[in-house]
Amino acid sequence: MAGFYVLIKCFEQEDDYSNLRAEPSKMDELIAIISCEIHLIIFFIVLVSCAPNETLSKPILGETELPAFRYLALGDSYTIGESVSAEERWPNQLAKLLESENIKSEITIIARTGWTTSELWQGIQAEEIQPPYDLVSLLIGVNNQYRGYDINEYRDQFNFLLHKSIEYADGDANRVLVLSIPDWSMTPFASSRNREQIAKELDKFNLVNRESSEKVGVPYVDVTPISREAVNDTTLIAQDGLHPSGKMYALWAEKALPIVKEILISSK
């Protein structure tokens, strides 16, 4: 308020300025007016300097929080993360990697240890899923191989699940991700079994799911080579001697990350 009072008083005395210059007896009053004008200049300088900085108040590009993308993960023990914590599951580690790049996710997992293709479908039907999802991952088949089920039956049931996955992704095959079956022949659990035979059978099952995925344009992540590194690195195996450790799941997530990022970018 004091600043505005000074401003008003200066304008009130402006008309007398020329007269004051001609009358030396009023020199003190002239000095007072000059002082008043100086205060007026200072007042405007302070007023401008106190104005908000519009450039700094604007949001920084890239810091705007986007809604979380919805992710549905379908599978068996390799998706639910048997013998590891929830945070160590590969879908959760994938979500963590995305979060580090400011991409948040909302994960729904439908998976259980021991499930075959037909049991996964039963499990899906028992859940109240809410499509469409921004991303759907599918990893299934190891228990079909383990139980000795016919590979042609696996082909039919996998194709059915693959098309359901595309349906859950709003009909967009590019928003579905298929992972290969890891090779459990390299684990301590298989030490008393025919490891070579197991590996060959898994290769055949993986050929089926890869060809099915490529036929409909679904991205494919081959994690089988990573699982075979366990023969020289026991830290890639969980304490149960059969399933992957959190360390191996981290490698899966890292391999899937660039593909998933491309999926999310292309689906915008």
Residue ranges and their predicted role:
Residues 2-7:
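Extreme N-terminal basic, low-complexity initiation segments
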Residues 16-19:
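Intrinsic-disorder-associated, low-complexity terminal segments enriched in Asp/Asn/His/Tyr and depleted
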Residues 51-113, 123-132:
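Serine-esterase "nucleophile elbow" of acetyl-processing enzymes
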Residues 122-268:
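Alpha-helical cap/lid subdomain in secreted, periplasmic
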